[in-house]
Amino acid sequence: MRVTRRHFFFSFFFLFLFALIFSSCALEKAQTLSSQNSGGNNSQGTTTSEIVGNDITPLSLNNSSVTVPLEGGKEAILLVVSADPLSSVQSFQLTTPQNPKTLTKFLSADTEEDTEEDLHMLLRNLESEIPEGTPLAESQTKFLTRYLKIGDSRDFKVIKSFTSKDEYTVVTATLVYEHEDFEVFLDSRDLQRLSSSEIQEIFDNFAQVLPKEFEFFGEPSDIDKNSKFTVLLTQEVNKMGELYNALVTGWFFGIDLFASQVYPASNGMEIFYGMVPDPNGEVGPATHDLIMKENIIPSYLVHELQHLISFGQHVIKNKTMSEANWLNEDISHLIEDIHPPRTDSEEIYSENYMVETGLENPSRVSTFLADIDRVCFLGCSAGLQERGGGYLFLRYAYEMIEFGILENLEEFLQRLLDGKQIGLNNLKYALFGDESADQALSDLVGLFALTIYFAGSDELSDPLFSIKGINLRGASSDNRGTMLNGPAVISATQFPLTGILEGFSMAYVKVSGQDIANQGGELTLEVSDSKRFKAYLIQ
C-alpha cells in the first residue's frame, strides 16, 4: 500500500510540476570542461548558473524516440536521464530534419577507466571474503584497557596495505581521550601533532554528534564487551596515502571484529583508524593544518563510525554481506552533514541540525557536477565523482522525506543500515519499503535531475527544487574556496549528436535558438532502451 501511495503521488506531482513556470537568473562566468559529443569527439561543456527557459515538458519515449517541435529563436535544454538498475551503458542521439541520420546500432560499453584507485573497495572486497561462521574476537580488550588511564599506552596492529588481511605493523599508542561511548588513542610518535586542547575540542564535538548518529543508524556492535569503540590516530594512515599516492584519511576494516587466530591483523575490537596532522609532509602527503583539524578529522570520525555501525548491522547482526561500497560511502558522506558547525555545536540539537553540509562534501559535489554526464552516481563505483553524486542524491532524498514527499525519515535512515539487502535493493527498500520499486526510484531520479538544474536559482521559491544543505550555484564555506556553478551543460553545435550514459546518470544538452531555426525547428531524441530513460525539455 505504501508503494501504491507513492506512485500516485509521483503521478500527481509531475502533473503539477509540468505546470510550473520558471524564470532565468543572472549569468556568471562559466568554467570550461570537456563533455562527450557526437562521434566520440569532445565538445565544450560548461558549468554555469544560467537557467535557460521557463517551461518543463516531459517527453514520452514510446518506441524509443520522440520528436519535439520547438519555438523558433528560443534556447532549449534537453535533459536526458538514464535510470538503469543494471548499470549498463545506454546511448541516446539527437537528430534534426536537416541531419536525420539515425544510429544503426547504439554504442556498446566503452567507458573510461576511473584512474583514481578506489582504495576502500579493496577493504570491502577483503571483507566479502570473510566466511560465514568465522569466530568473533573473544572479550579480551576489556581486560587490556580496564586499568588504562589518560597517558597510559598499549599496542595496536595496523594493516600495511589494503590488499592483505595478514600483514600488519605494531604501533604503540597513548590514551588521550575517554568517553562513555569511545576512547581515543594517539600514536606515541605523533603526540606533538595535536595539542591537548585540540584533542579536547575535536572529540568533545564528536561526542555531541554520537546521540544523533546512534538514533539514525543504531549503535556499534560490542564484540569485546567493553561498551566502547576505539579511535586510533596514527601516522600509519598517512603512510598508506604515500603508498598509494593518494590522500587516505582513515578506514574501518571488518576483520578487527574477528578472532586474531583467523586474521592475524585483527585487534579484536570495534576500532577505526585516522590520519594525523602533517602540514610538512613528513610521514605522507602534506595536509593543510586548518583543513586537517576543521575539515578532515571531524569528517572522518563520523564517516568511519558509520562504516563500523554498518558492518555490525549487516554482517554481525543480520548475517548478510557488508554494504555495497558505493552506498556505504554515500551514507558515510551523508552522515558527515550531522557534524555540528564549527562555531555552534548546539546546532545539532535543533530542528535545523543538517542545515549545513559537511565541510568536505562541497568539493566532492563539485567534481560530480563538472563531469555530470560521465558519472554513474548510483549502483556503480565509489570514485570521488560518483560519491559526490551519490551523497547529493541521498541528501536530496533526506530532504524530500522532511517535506513529506517520501515517508518516515527515521525509517529511511535505519533501513539503510539495518536491512537485509545491499546496494540498489537496499536503497529502494529504505526509500519505498519495497526492494523492487524500480519505477519509484526512476521517478525520484528524474526529479533529482531537474532539481540539480534549477537548484540555487533566486527565481525558485519551491523547496522541492532546492537542496537546502548546499548551494549548487554559489560559494561554499569549506575552507577550500569551492565554488559550485551548477551542472555541466553540453552545447550542441552539430547534429546528429550522440551521447552515452551509464546506469543512473544524466546529461544536459543546450541547443541555441539560431541552431533550432537552422535545423528545421524540431529535434528528435532516440534512445537505446526506452525503459531505461527519462527525458525533459526545458525552454
Residues covered by each model-derived region:
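Sec-dependent bacterial lipoprotein signal peptides
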Residues: 1-23
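Acidic/polar low-complexity interaction segments
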Residues: 81, 106-177, 181-191
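Acidic/His/Gly-enriched intrinsically disordered linker/tail segments
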Residues: 295, 299-300, 318-390, 399-400, ...
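Beta/coil-rich, acidic/histidine-enriched accessory regions frequently appended to metallopeptidases
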Residues: 46-65, 69-71, 421-539
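Juxtacatalytic substrate-recognition/specificity segment
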Residues: 178-324, 331, 335, 342-343
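Bacterial Sec-dependent N-terminal signal peptides
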Residues: 19-54
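Alpha-helical scaffold elements that line and support the substrate/ligand-binding pocket
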Residues: 304-311, 332, 386-407
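Long, charge-dense tracts
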Residues: 53-133
